[in-house]
Amino acid sequence: GIADCAGAPVVAVTADAYDQARAAAAKVVVEYEELTPVLDIEDALEREQYTYPPQIMTYGDPDASIAAAPRRIKGELRCGGQDHFYLESNIALAVPRDDGDLDIYSSTQHPSEVQHGVAHTLGVPSNAVTVEVRRMGGGFGGKESQPTIIAAIAALMADITGRPAKLRLRRDDDMIVTGKRHDFLFRYEAGFDETGRIAGVDILMGMRSGNVADLSPGVLARALCHADNCYYLPNARLSGYPCKTNTVSNTAFRGFGGPQGMIVIE
């Protein structure tokens, strides 16, 4: 297999106590063949490396309207990422039942996705997996899709050992291996008149999707659809590129692409 980002799961270790498991995991030696990574948005754009096809919205004639405008502006803008920093890190408990089914206790915003992911991992029907969310110590989008792999690993260990298994990420590990708010690179050009009325815009949005798509399609679509904000754009080309990089996949975050789309027009 290929570990295509820092924090990619390679091996799971079980023990009777949390500290024992961490100590054992620290003794694992993995030999890697180094590949050339793509770490930033510019490299991914240059290589045309995306997690799914680009999204391009065009209406009117942006090229002609910008060229004919008495005034023009052109530039580049960056919008950084952000960690959710929920108080409770990702955690899951998997408990085998006497009838062969499995109970999962997960800190998740999306129990049905956890159910589907665990069932797929174990090769069992979804009705063999029951997911319960007793409480959740914060989420903000960070526990919409990300808890699935945590629960799947715990479930796999429980299935192998026949005993309850819990996987709890330390804060530093959680920040390394889970996705964040998508960071963006914007390249824009706009034409307007002396009163500030916009004639046309051409906006490129390069979004760091990470190593897999995750929820990037919806985030990028919302960023594109929020790019006009409160302004009337008679002619526009809005191009969104979900850049595939060797970094952990970014994910849902409050606003879900809307804030990134709005900041570029401002």
Regions from the language model: what does each represent?
Residues G1-E266:
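Structural alpha/beta core scaffold segments of enzyme domains
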